[in-house]
């Protein structure tokens, strides 16, 4: 990560690359990919979202299913199965050790997951313990507040962080040190405060974090644009301050 502090006024938040890996590919050679794959090979396949429903991992599985259906319309739809736990740690451990209870499984991950793997937070498994299949796209961070929040702009939020002795509660689908946590930490640091003292609540996916924001349990959501747009499309009410 760069040591240069981006200015929130520039709406500069690091993009998150979303990737899929398939541990089953290395464990079950009979599962054929590419041009040689058949509908029978694909039967029973699923995409595992290592979170609760509604977040970026859920959306990644949806995109994967749509992509496969477009190029292989005869294949059975790719099912989505949710496996929360450690915001990806449980899914990675089971994929790396062949304990996914599925011979035909893709697992949605992000560059935030890779950061946790590099930091050793997903167990002792190396990054090449699984087979990385594809990158689906990029996503951008957002800063959002409750629709009745007094903050209408990011500048107002930053001023409140500078002036208030009462710390705000941030929340997102990421643990301490994750990319979602880093977004909140950048805001707090830019306001002249110590990020180590900020209040941050980790959720099992962005969907759960957005529910907490809408319910008034956190003050600021620092997640990703795709999960925010998906939540709004399903009726969630919140105010975006920055992308």
Q: Where are the model-predicted features located?
A:
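Loop/turn elements at helix/coil->beta-strand transitions in domains of secreted/extracellular proteins
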Residues: 102-104, 166-167, 236-238
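N-terminal (or domain-start) structured segment
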Residues: 33-127, 176, 192-230
């Amino acid at each position: 990560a760069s040591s240069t502090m981006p200015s929130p006024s520039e709406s500069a938040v690091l993009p998150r690359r979303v990737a899929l890996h398939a541990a089953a590919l290395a464990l079950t050679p009979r599962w054929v990919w590419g041009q040689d794959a058949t509908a029978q090979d694909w039967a029973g396949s699923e995409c595992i979202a290592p979170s609760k429903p509604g977040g970026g991992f859920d959306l990644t599985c949806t995109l994967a299913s749509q992509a496969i259906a477009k190029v292989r319309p005869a294949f059975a739809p790719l099912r989505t199965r949710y496996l929360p736990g450690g915001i990806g740690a449980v899914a990675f451990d089971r994929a790396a050790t062949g304990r996914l209870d599925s011979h035909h499984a893709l697992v949605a991950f992000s560059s935030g997951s890779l950061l946790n793997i590099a930091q050793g937070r997903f167990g002792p498994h190396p990054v090449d313990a699984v087979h990385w299949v594809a990158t689906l796209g990029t996503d951008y961070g957002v800063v959002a507040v409750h629709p009745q929040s007094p903050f209408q702009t990011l500048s107002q939020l930053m001023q409140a962080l500078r002036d208030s002795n009462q710390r705000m509660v941030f929340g997102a689908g990421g643990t301490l040190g994750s990319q979602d946590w880093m977004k909140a930490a950048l805001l707090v640091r830019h306001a002249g405060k110590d990020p180590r003292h900020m209040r941050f609540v980790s959720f099992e996916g962005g969907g759960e974090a957005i529910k907490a924001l809408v319910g008034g349990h956190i003050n600021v959501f620092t997640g990703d644009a795709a999960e925010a747009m998906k939540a709004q499309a399903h009726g969630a009410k919140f105010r975006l301050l920055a992308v």
